Curated annotation (Swiss-Prot):
Purpose: Catalyzes the conversion of dethiobiotin (DTB) to biotin by the insertion of a sulfur atom into dethiobiotin via a radical-based mechanism.
Chain residues that bind [4Fe-4S] cluster: 47, 51, 54
Highest taxon above the source species: Bacteria
Pathway connected to this protein: Cofactor biosynthesis; biotin biosynthesis; biotin from 7,8-diaminononanoate: step 2/2
Organism the protein comes from: Methylacidiphilum infernorum (isolate V4) (Methylokorus infernorum (strain V4))
NCBIfam families: bioB
Catalytic activities: (4R,5S)-dethiobiotin + (sulfur carrier)-SH + 2 reduced [2Fe-2S]-[ferredoxin] + 2 S-adenosyl-L-methionine = (sulfur carrier)-H + biotin + 2 5'-deoxyadenosine + 2 L-methionine + 2 oxidized [2Fe-2S]-[ferredoxin]
Record text on subunit structure and interactions: Homodimer.
Protein name per the record: Biotin synthase
Residue numbers binding [2Fe-2S] cluster: 91, 124, 184, 256
Intrachain S-S bonds: none
């Protein structure tokens, strides 16, 4: 069991040693391909939470308009299209505080999950905070994976949101693991946080009873109207070291390069794969922001002699 200081030492290793160990750790999973995931925003905007990086918060004036929950047929068709494009995981995101007992939307989400479970894809949901009862309802409906990111470390968290606490996020993560759902949990880097905050986040994930099944690493994308707009861009080497350190700590977890991939050039993306990334989001949009074109993903994988993971 590594402590925070040990994680910090890993991060600061000479780059050749860091990448070499990350490659060895990646081999332990036995996976050879890159997983394709498709993310669908099933309910956009109007969120009650005040996360300062988020275009979907009702607290800020952004280009994102509040939308109603998509109906079952729209979601089903989007899932079929994702499957045709090669996605093996279908991820649904909803902008609200969470899912709680007695709410109409909770019943609607469970009904949607039951219907699209027949697609033959692994289904993931990101819908905010849960209670143990609602987590069980989701599982019984056919959900396999629940996403709930820590986003940053506990020291920096009060700087990014005031409508909930870091401990609230940890509580939902504990519930997800307790009921037997697979956990997807990671964070965002480049929001003005310190290295210490990023490593604190990794340490919190590392301290869980069970490692997350997947860990998304998001590069902050500045969105006009949000408080963090204008934050200086992330140094690409910070991203590479973060990915490699995550891979070493979590050899069996999927490391997913999520939001912000469009900001990275081909050389940086190549280093990301070398550092341990084995999962990406495909599709034209990631919730509210544009994504890398699928043709470019395939072209880079071909150039690197990497293959898409088959179902």
């Amino acid at each position: 069991m590594k402590d925070y200081c040990a994680i910090e030492q890993i991060y600061h290793r000479p780059l050749d040693e860091l990448l070499g160990e990350a490659l060895q750790a990646k081999k332990l999973s036995g996976r050879n391909g890159v997983q394709f995931c498709q993310l669908l925003n099933i309910k956009s905007g109007g969120c009650s939470e005040d996360c300062k990086y988020c275009a979907q918060s009702a607290h800020y004036r952004t280009p994102i308009e509040k939308g109603a929950l998509l109906d079952e047929e729209e979601i089903l068709q989007a899932g079929l299209q994702a499957k045709e494009k090669g996605a093996s995981r279908f991820c649904l995101g909803a902008a609200w505080r969470g899912l709680f007992e007695g709410e109409t939307k909770t019943k609607k989400i469970c009904k949607i999950i039951s219907k699209i479970s027949s697609l033959g894809m692994e289904l993931c949901l990101s819908a905010g905070f849960l209670t143990e009862k609602t987590a069980l309802m989701l599982k019984e409906s056919g959900l396999k994976v629940y996403n709930h990111n820590l986003n940053t470390g506990p020291s920096y968290y009060p700087r990014i949101a005031s409508t909930h606490r870091f401990e609230d996020r940890l509580q939902t993560i504990r519930i997800v693991q307790k009921v037997g759902l697979k956990l997807c949990s990671g964070g965002i880097i480049g929001m003005g946080e310190r290295l210490k905050d990023r490593l604190e986040m990794l340490f919190c994930l590392y301290s869980l009873p069970e490692a997350p099944e997947s860990i998304p690493i998001n590069v902050y994308m500045p969105i006009e109207g949000t408080p963090f707009y204008g934050t200086p861009p992330l140094d690409y080497m910070d991203l590479i070291r973060m990915i490699a350190t995550t891979r070493i700590l979590f050899p069996l977890s999927r490391i997913r390069l999520a939001a912000g991939r469009k900001l990275l050039d081909e050389k940086t993306l190549t280093l990301c794969y070398l550092a341990g990334v084995d999962s990406i989001f495909i599709g034209e949009k990631l919730l509210t922001q544009s994504n890398v074109q699928l043709e470019k993903d395939y072209a880079l994988l071909k150039k690197l002699n990497l293959r898409k993971e088959e179902r």
